[in-house]
């Protein structure tokens, strides 16, 4: 049995759907989120639990061979914080899985995760990677770079909806291996019960590294209209949720070119071109 934690989110939901399509027996951790209803109808078994409640996690992992977690506090509210979920909550889940002798623990981290990072989210991801490596379980760390669907939709889609210029940081010329969520799902599915994925960190990027300015230019080609751009300095205000400003600034402070040939060869996955994602996100009107 496979336990998916974070199934109510985009990535976790897609992974759950993929596992069910493969005929896998899937249990999903839920707090009664309506977003899980379709997955339950499709065959996933719900179990009530919370990353902040160790006792509930002990029940959730009973009889489980593989844990896959995509959960984070980025879109949570109430008493959920990066510390309570991404640090303490993940440690609770690791402890419960280790105590239950889970055979493989698949953790969704981030390409830029680093325990020494000044950014709390990236630091907690990095610290969780370290804890998982010490756990004694076979582990797989998925470290995807920036999701096209999420960030293109937020940065470009918001501007289109509001009839405003696209706002970019700096000169928008630093290159990044933006990746489609579906490609991360493919790697996750290929990693389950796969010794080639055991005890390793898998960086996941897209088929090419492009700058934000290039992204806007190519999206404009896809939708068949010009897109004007406003550039603001690092630290300037952005028309996207303030919690995401830090990552947007960071994309103009370093480049991230993720080599993918070895991942493609090892796991048999293909990578989705930028234009294909843009066509889904921004259909011509």
Label each PLM-derived region with a short phrase.
Residues 76-89:
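Short alpha-helical oligomerization interface
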Residues 1-25, 31-41, 46, 52-55, ...:
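Oxidoreductase cofactor-interface core, primarily capturing Rossmann-like NAD(P)-dependent enzymes
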Residues 89-92, 96:
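Short, conserved SAM-binding segment of the class I
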Residues 61, 65-68, 86, 106:
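N-terminal Rossmann-like NAD(P) cofactor-binding module of classical short-chain dehydrogenase/reductase
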Residues 1, 65-66, 104, 249-255:
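Structural motif
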Residues 70-71, 109:
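Glycine-rich, N-terminal phosphate-binding loop of Rossmann-like dinucleotide-binding domains
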Residues 222-223, 233-285:
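A hydrophobic C-terminal alpha-helical subdomain
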Residues 48, 231:
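Conserved residues in the N-terminal Rossmann fold of short-chain dehydrogenase/reductase
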């Amino acid at each position: 049995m496979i336990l998916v934690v974070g199934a109510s989110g985009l990535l976790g939901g897609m992974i759950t759907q993929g596992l069910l399509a493969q005929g896998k027996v899937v249990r999903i951790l839920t707090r009664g989120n309506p977003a899980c209803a379709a997955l339950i109808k499709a065959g996933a078994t719900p179990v009530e639990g919370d990353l902040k409640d160790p006792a509930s996690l002990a029940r959730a992992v009973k009889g489980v061979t593989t844990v896959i977690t995509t959960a984070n506090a980025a879109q949570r509210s109430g008493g959920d914080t990066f510390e309570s979920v991404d640090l303490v909550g993940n440690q609770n889940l690791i402890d419960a899985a280790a105590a239950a002798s889970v055979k493989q623990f698949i953790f969704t981290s981030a390409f830029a995760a680093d325990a020494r990072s000044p950014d709390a989210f990236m630091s907690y991801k990095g610290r969780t990677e370290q804890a998982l490596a010490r756990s004694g379980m076979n582990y797989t760390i998925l470290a995807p770079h920036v999701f096209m669907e999420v960030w293109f939709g937020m940065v470009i889609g918001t501007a289109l909806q509001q009839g405003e210029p696209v706002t970019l940081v700096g000169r928008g010329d630093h290159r990044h291996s933006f990746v489609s969520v579906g490609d991360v799902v493919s790697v996750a599915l290929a990693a389950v019960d796969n010794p080639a994925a055991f005890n390793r960190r898998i960086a996941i990027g897209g088929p090419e590294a492009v700058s934000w300015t290039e992204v806007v230019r190519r999206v404009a080609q896809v939708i068949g209209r010009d897109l004007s751009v406003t550039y603001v300095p690092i630290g300037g205000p952005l028309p996207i949720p303030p919690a995401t400003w830090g990552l947007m600034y960071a994309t103009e402070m370093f480049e991230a070119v993720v080599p993918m040939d070895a991942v493609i060869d090892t796991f048999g996955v293909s990578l989705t071109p930028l234009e294909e994602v843009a066509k889904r996100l921004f259909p011509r009107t």
